[in-house]
Curated annotation (Swiss-Prot):
Keywords for this protein: Cell cycle, Cell division, Coiled coil, Cytoplasm, Cytoskeleton, Microtubule, Mitosis
Cystine bridges: none
Record localization: Cytoplasm, Cytoskeleton, Microtubule organizing center, Centrosome; Cytoplasm, Cytoskeleton, Spindle
Assembly and binders: Component of the HAUS augmin-like complex. The complex interacts with the gamma-tubulin ring complex and this interaction is required for spindle assembly.
Protein name: HAUS augmin-like complex subunit 3
GO biological process, one term: spindle assembly
Chief location of this protein within or outside the cell: cytoplasm
Record-linked PANTHER family: GOLGIN- RELATED, HAUS AUGMIN-LIKE COMPLEX SUBUNIT 3
Length: 597
């Protein structure tokens, strides 16, 4: 409860007329004053209805004031009573009066003693009331804190139970992942890891693919070759030439014989062709000559037979020469040329053979590429599967290590929990029916905690739990104050940094007005600096003049005492009026004494 609320409650107890309309927050500032706080605490704890003057006495006092009669205070009333007693009491009763005075003094002392005791009791009562109020407030705060802590513990317990249940479910799920299935159907129904997958179908497909690839290779690279060779008798020699490209040495002689047979057939056919062409050419030439000379023969039929015979003999001789020349060409030159041309026959044959080999090689390379692609795919699938198994094995090993470390930590925590339980089951730590206020000497943990929180290493005879609680509260308050100070310092630091950044930005903008060039001085600043220089020169000149005037006035004051007195009076007039009045009074007295003399 705040101080303002306690003050308002006290006023309401004293039956203040407008106490219900007051707000305690409006009076909190009164308790911040150091001088007023003790009085206000005493007033809130000790004031009661007995300290309030009743309305009847107030009304009688007000009527006495309004009547105009004088109201004497305590001292004046005592003096009046003394004079009254002196004037009225006879001298015979002086002894009795002295006794009465002694009794009065004794009673006064007793009264003072009772008053002091009453004040002490009131102070004790006020302290007890204050302690009661504090204890009630503390009890309420403790109850609220207990409820909050209880609620927090319940929420924490629920969260902990939920987390533990989720951990148990997760562990069960994890154990179901790593558990060995009893049947293959259970494994194939819900595969979790790669190692749990059945690879029979995949391996059977790979075996079928490998068998198909093997049969394809045998058919197209081994068995298909013999079928292609045995398929036709006409292409036997060409295929034998192609087979030689694979490195078979048995068909080399057959190839040479075949080439010689082809060359010989080519030579014979070429020789016959040339002879036939020569005969046909001779026949064509004879026919053409006969056609051309038929008219001439008819015209010259009448010529002499002698000229004809001579002509016939000359023609026969020419014919014989031509035949001899033709025979020499056909027997000597033509066979050599035909043999040379027969050798040129090998070029298209060899070219065709090489073309066939190139086509076969291209076909084989394409088939080999297909086979290689299939093998590479198969190898890649196997390597990918192997990599997946290796990664899964590595993950399983990591999980195994982590589970081992978790099991070890759980064992250690279980051992520590057992140690704590055995420690807490100690008889000395059990709560007694009457809680102890002092800390037991065997409770070393509480003593060490007290030393740690208090920071005092001195040996104390008794240490209480209340002191430990107060030290802990003080530590928490210090921590809260330090956190508040840190927050305030961080805010001030951030504010200073922001101001510094803004000032730096302004300075940068001011020093770099055009972006890149540094401006040490601006025209405005240079003009102001020149103006300040001129003003400083004027000020210096004025200062020199003032110093000259001061020196001159000092010389005048030193030489003239009247001016010194005048100066002193001016100083007193502005600084010390009392001194001026005393001096003026002295002067007036002197002038008055001189005039009377």
């Amino acid at each position: 409860m705040s101080g303002g609320d306690r003050f308002v409650q006290t006023l309401q107890k004293l039956n203040y007329p407008k106490g219900a309309q007051l707000d305690g927050e409006d009076f909190d500032w009164l308790f911040e004053a150091v001088d007023l706080k003790p009085f206000l605490d005493w007033f809130c704890s000790a004031a009661s209805e007995q300290n309030v003057v009743p309305d009847e006495k107030l009304q009688a006092f007000n009527t006495l004031k309004e009547s105009g009669k004088p109201v004497l205070d305590e001292k004046a009333l005592d003096e009046v009573l003394k004079t009254f007693s002196i004037s009225k009491v006879p001298a015979i009763e002086e002894v009795a009066i002295e006794k009465l005075e002694e009794e009065v003094k004794a009673l006064q002392k007793q009264k003072n003693l009772h008053i002091r005791r009453r004040n002490k009791l009131q102070m004790v009562e006020s302290g007890n009331r204050q302690m009661c109020l504090k204890s009630k407030d503390k009890e309420e705060e403790t109850g609220r804190a207990f409820q909050e802590v209880l609620h927090l513990l319940r929420v924490t317990n629920k969260k902990l139970n939920h987390e533990l249940q989720s951990i148990v479910n997760g562990v069960q799920t994890l154990m179901s992942f790593f558990s060995t299935p009893e049947t293959a159907c259970e494994l194939s129904s819900q595969p979790i890891f790669l190692s749990q997958l059945l690879l029979d179908k995949y391996l059977s497909l790979e075996e079928q693919s490998t068998a198909a690839l093997t049969s394809f290779t045998k058919e197209h690279f081994f068995e298909g070759m013999s079928k292609f060779v045995e398929g036709s008798d006409e292409n036997f020699q060409l295929v034998q030439l192609n087979v030689n490209s694979f490195g078979e040495d048995g068909t080399t002689e057959d190839k040479c014989k075949e080439m010689m047979r082809l060359q010989l057939a080519y030579i014979c056919a070429k020789h016959k062709l040339i002879q036939m062409k020569a005969k046909s050419a001779s026949l064509k030439v004879g026919l053409q000559w006969a056609e051309n000379n038929a008219s001439v023969v008819q015209d010259k039929a009448s010529q002499k037979e002698e000229n004809l015979k001579v002509r016939i003999t000359s023609l026969k001789n020419e014919t014989l020469q031509i035949e001899n020349h033709t025979n020499s060409i056909s027997n000597e030159k033509l066979p050599g040329l035909v043999r040379d041309n027969a050798q040129l026959l090998n070029m298209p044959i060899v070219k065709g053979d090489y073309d066939l080999q190139m086509a076969h090689q291209t076909s084989c390379s394409s088939r080999q590429d297909l086979v290689c692609d299939h093998l590479m795919k198969q190898k890649a699938s196997f390597e990918l599967l192997q990599l997946g198994y290796e990664l899964e094995l590595r993950k399983h090993r990591d999980v195994y290590r982590e589970l081992g470390s978790i099991v070890q930590e759980l064992k250690e925590s279980g051992d520590k929990l057992e140690e704590r339980l055995t420690m807490l089951s100690d008889v000395n730590l059990l709560s007694a029916s009457k809680p102890r206020s002092n800390i037991d000497s065997k409770d070393l943990t509480s003593h060490r905690l007290y030393q740690l929180l208090d920071g005092d290493n001195t040996q104390k005879l008794f240490r209480t739990y209340d002191g430990l609680e107060s030290v802990a509260q003080k530590l928490s308050q210090d921590i809260a104050s330090m956190r508040d100070q840190l927050e305030v310092s961080e805010q001030e630091h951030s504010l200073l940094l922001s101001k510094l950044d803004s000032h730096l930005k302004e300075l940068r903008d001011f020093m770099y007005p055009e972006g890149n060039t540094l401006m040490l001085t601006t025209p405005e600043l240079s003009g102001e600096f020149h103006q300040l220089g001129s003003q400083l020169e004027k000020l210096n000149h004025i200062t020199v003049e003032i110093l000259g005037d001061l020196q001159l006035k000092r010389k005048m004051l030193e030489s003239n005492k009247l001016q010194q007195i005048e100066k002193q009076l001016y100083v007193y007039f502005f600084q010390n009026e009392e001194q001026l009045k005393s001096i003026v009074g002295k002067l007036e007295a002197q002038t008055g004494g001189g005039s009377s003399a």
